[in-house]
A protein has these predicted regions:
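Active-site bordering "gate/hinge" segments
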Residues: 1-262, 398, 408-410
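Dual-mode signal for accessory low-complexity, basic/Gly-rich regions
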Residues: 292-361
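Short polybasic amphipathic segments
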Residues: 209-212, 281-284, 291, 386-394
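Short linear motifs in exposed loops
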Residues: 223, 293-294, 403
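Long, well-ordered mid-to-C-terminal structural blocks that present hydrophobic/aromatic surfaces
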Residues: 252-310
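Short conserved micro-motifs at the rims of enzyme active sites and ligand-binding pockets
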Residues: 111, 155-157, 277, 305, ...
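A structural signal for short secondary-structure junctions
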Residues: 258-259, 274-277, 284-285, 309-313, ...
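Extended hydrophobic packing segments that form well-structured cores
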Residues: 366-410
Length: 410
């Protein structure tokens, strides 16, 4: 068995070669916490090894983010740094790859004025709209991944000391990403091929709608837009580069019709959003719009999150993940959406991935007419349970079991 350092290099190689599939002469931006600098350097090494033209580092720091929200002048939260906009727009226009390493303290912004967070999110969302649209349309290769930080590891394993918690979280992350000492890239390709089998079956059924029910109170009907398709595993950029946007991933996803979601959906796991924990929550929707929001913890944060703009009150993603999946079977609550969403079926409120055939040649107005939701935000939340039932309704009215007892029926 390889030691942890060798496995970390295998993981970096996986992200560069399979997550982003870096091409010779292509630039790479790594958006990364300063605490993760050693791993970012491994990723840079691997990128240059396959012919990357230049690696650009975009650092961030939990501590500095927190004290900015606490002590900066109030007007700062209605402004955005133009250099950030210029960087995002420039590299996305040229088709550079973008690696985002998410490893934040789940409660870093606990106690921060939520109005400052909301205003900052709004101004940033508007300024980075062009970049976000390019990302959602897969106009450039992008990948989201995570590695442990001490604050995050202690949140996941509070019973362990810091070193033991870090070691345990590394083990679980590598396991979820199928980095096991063998050929990590080959392992990932095999997994991606398995996801594609379910993608094909769902696309062949071409359901008109899905009906969700379970014992914790979910009773939701989700209409799917005409011409929708399911995706999962790998994606293809505008330049024809195949990449994996999330590592790990267990999901198969599409978009709901913007005005076609009705009923009640109950979250099955806490949500970590903007450095705050939201727990025990549910939504009621009518004609696609969230009309009621309830949460046992963080209700004000959740209300702000789903009202940052008009589109935030509508769903933009429906994703299927078997309850019997490796991350779910670990029994670990990661307080990190990248991992927790891959332990559970989930939805997202806000921006939709335009999973509509021919979407690349459609205008925003044409996409809206087809039922695609637009927003400056996209927030995943988990709804899967061991008894979740999902029934697909075909265009001729037939009911086909999609999920039985939390996992695929086919």
């Amino acid at each position: 068995m390889k030691d942890i350092a060798a496995l970390q290099r295998d993981y970096a190689r996986l992200l560069i070669r399979e997550g982003l599939n870096i091409q010779k002469g292509q630039r790479l931006v790594i958006n990364c916490p300063v605490d993760c600098a050693p791993f970012a350097r491994l990723c840079a090494d691997e990128a240059y090894a396959v012919g990357c033209r230049e690696v650009i580092m975009k650092w961030r720091d939990d501590y500095l983010a927190r004290i900015k929200y606490l002590y900066a002048e109030d007007s700062v939260f209605d402004e955005v740094n133009q250099w950030e906009v210029l960087l995002a727009d420039t590299v996305s226009e040229e088709g550079a790859a973008w690696l985002a390493i998410h490893a934040d303290d789940p409660e870093n912004l606990k106690g921060v004025d939520p109005d400052r967070i909301r205003r900052s999110q709004i101004v940033s969302g508007k300024a980075l709209e062009k970049f976000r649209q390019r990302e959602m349309r897969d106009e450039f290769p992008w990948c989201v991944a995570s590695i442990p930080t001490e604050a995050w590891a202690k949140a996941v394993f509070p019973e362990l000391d810091a070193d033991a918690a870090m070691e345990r979280l590394w083990v679980e992350i590598l396991k979820a990403c199928r980095v096991d000492g063998g050929d990590a890239v080959a392992n990932w390709r095999t997994h991606s091929d398995e996801l594609q089998k379910h993608v094909k079956m769902l696309n062949d059924y071409n359901f008109k709608s899905l009906h969700y029910t379970n014992s914790i109170g979910t009773d939701l009907t989700v209409e799917l837009p005409e011409g929708h398709f399911w995706a999962g595993g790998s994606e293809t950029s505008a330049a024809g580069i195949e990449f994996s946007a999330n590592i790990p991933t267990e999901e198969i996803f599409t978009l709901p019709k913007r005005d076609g979601v009705n009923g009640t959906i109950v979250a099955s796991k806490p949500l970590c959003h903007n450095g705050n924990i939201i727990d025990g929550f549910r939504f009621t929707l009518k004609d696609g719009k969230i009309t009621e929001v309830h949460a046992k913890q963080g209700e004000d944060i959740l209300r702000d999150a789903c009202t940052v703009d008009e589109g935030a009150s509508f769903f933009g993603e429906v994703a299927l993940v078997p309850y019997d999946s490796p991350i779910s079977n670990s029994g670990i609550l990661f307080y990190n959406t990248l991992f927790d969403e891959n332990a559970s079926c989930h939805f997202a409120f806000g921006e939709a991935y335009p999973c509509i055939t021919g979407s690349e040649s459609m205008s925003e107005e044409e996409l809206k007419a087809r039922g695609v939701n637009f927003s400056m935000t996209h927030v995943d939340f988990m709804v899967g349970t061991a008894d979740l039932s999902i029934v697909g309704i075909t265009h001729d009215g037939k009911e086909i079991p999609v999920f039985v007892n939390g996992s695929f029926a086919f």
